Regions:
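Cleavable N-terminal signal peptides of Sec/SRP-targeted secreted and luminal proteins
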Residues: 5-22
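Signature for phosphate-centric chemistry
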Residues: 23-166, 170-462
């Protein structure tokens, strides 16, 4: 009788447990900070594609819907940001400053604060300075495998061994190592041990922003170019976040500057991105605070790399023309019946490489500019770097031959099809290549890097 009762209790316990598990919300995962989706360019790729948390190699081939079964890929260009990295030296110095305040000045009694003061140690060192971490290595290895599964006729062992896949990278260590990691993802996938594959360092393409004199002088090194950013930092939304942090720590308001507020946000973001830890630092922010921090970062990217100034996007003219030169070459070879000599181009750079190009192409442009005073009206904005530019962000352009000279171009951002702005077709996100070229005709005929980047005697106002 006791045995029967015991089995009855266990059976009902299992049923209840299963029911509870079925109702678990993935967003309630305590290992993921509640504010993780607001980390801007410091965010994980998995926050943009949450299904990867269950299976990092998962792909969904059904997202590619060519207008006919005849369509075959003939060329693929991927422009990819480097993987997860350490903070820069500047950020690390600010983190150390904040940590010292928390250790010596904070008098709050919350458990998370005691954890920082007694268990957490400042493990970031200045020599780390933006270098790739192991997670960043894995970001590119896994991306290589997923893209090879999504486009098996392009990113194939045959094309790799045949020299039809080309690798180009920025000279920065984190980009070179990301490129090596992408290649390793493929060679390990196909167990290639008898051959190595070269890459080319090309800062002219992948760090064009450093070489555009007008951009450097008028925007990058010009405080007046980011006046909206600085005004927002001094505004009521940001002041509220700083005061709430000071209250949580129980320190004077004067100790928590904007830079230290940003350092606290980065501590949460880096701990999660690098170590997959929901750090006690994350408790300094609620969702309202995180949205303000996200907007402050978006505002900076908007005015320094995005739509804020015309030269921001025009600095990417070289890369823009290079992409279309490759597409035209592939189209020409295909039309004449030749094998496409550069089937795949993998180009690894920075968020600062991708954002000006996305801007030049017209992606994520809102009807109103982002300013210091319209935070409340921009809650539904398209321009959100948390969605656009996580670590390992990628813009992939795939050229298809659909038969009878019908060439089509499919853009994907972070492995999701997107539509070229101004080329909306409800039937497909894969427009005719000729229509794409016509849409960007003015840029293809103009957009001269040397002319755009020349520093005039009387620079344009910013």
């Amino acid at each position: 009788m006791l045995t029967f009762l015991w089995k009855f209790v266990v059976f009902h316990f299992l049923i209840i447990s299963c029911c509870l598990l079925d109702n678990v919300n993935p967003e309630d995962n305590l290992d993921i900070p509640a504010i993780a989706k607001y980390f801007n360019t410091k965010g994980r790729y998995e926050e943009v594609n949450p299904y990867l948390t269950e299976d990092i190699l998962a792909v969904n081939g059904s997202i590619l819907q060519p207008p006919s079964a005849q369509c075959q890929e003939i060329h693929l260009t991927a422009i990819i940001r480097h993987g997860t990295r350490y903070p820069t030296t500047k950020n690390i110095k600010e983190m150390q400053q904040l940590y010292n305040i928390v250790l010596h000045n904070a008098s709050g009694e919350a458990n998370w604060l005691r954890e920082i003061q007694t268990q957490w140690t400042m493990w970031y060192t200045e020599d780390m300075d933006g270098r790739l971490v192991q997670k960043g290595v894995n970001d590119h290895k896994h991306l290589a495998i997923r893209l090879s599964k999504l486009f098996p006729s392009m990113i194939s062992e045959e094309n790799l061994r045949g020299g039809f896949i080309r690798f180009i990278t920025s000279s920065k260590h984190r980009c070179v190592k990301s490129t090596l990691s992408f290649k390793a993802g493929l060679t390990e996938l196909w167990a290639i041990t008898d051959k190595e594959f070269d890459h080319v360092v090309n800062d002219t393409l992948m760090r064009f922003f450093d070489q555009c004199t007008r951009f450097v002088q008028e925007v990058d090194n010009n405080p007046s170019a980011v006046v909206e950013v600085n005004m927002f930092k001094q505004g009521p939304e940001m002041r509220s976040v700083q005061e709430k942090i000071a209250d949580r720590l129980r320190v004077p308001y004067s100790l928590i500057t904007h830079d230290l507020t940003e350092a606290a946000f980065y501590l949460c973001a880096y701990e999660f991105a690098i170590k997959a830890v929901n750090s006690p630092w994350c408790q300094l922010f609620d969702e309202v605070d995180a949205k303000v921090m996200e907007y402050a970062s978006d505002l900076r990217e908007y005015w320094k790399r995005g739509y804020g100034h015309d030269i921001n996007s025009k600095s990417s003219c070289r890369l823009f023309h290079d992409v279309f030169r490759r597409l035209n070459k592939a189209a020409g070879e295909n039309k004449s019946g030749q094998q496409v000599t550069e089937a795949v181009t993998i180009q690894v750079g920075h968020a600062d490489t991708l954002l000006p190009l996305l801007t030049l192409l017209g992606f994520f442009k809102d009807s109103d500019a982002l300013t210091s005073t319209n935070y409340a009206s921009q809650t539904q904005r398209s321009f959100r770097t948390s969605h656009m530019l996580p670590y390992a962000a990628n813009l992939v352009l795939v050229l298809y031959d659909c038969g009878g000279g019908d060439l089509r171009l499919q853009p994907l951002l972070n492995e999701k099809p997107v539509t070229f702005p101004g080329l909306t077709d409800p039937r497909t996100s894969m427009p005719l290549y000729e229509d794409v070229k016509e849409h960007y005709r003015e840029l293809l005929q103009g957009c001269d890097f040397e002319a755009e980047c020349q520093l005039f005697k009387h620079p344009a106002k910013v």
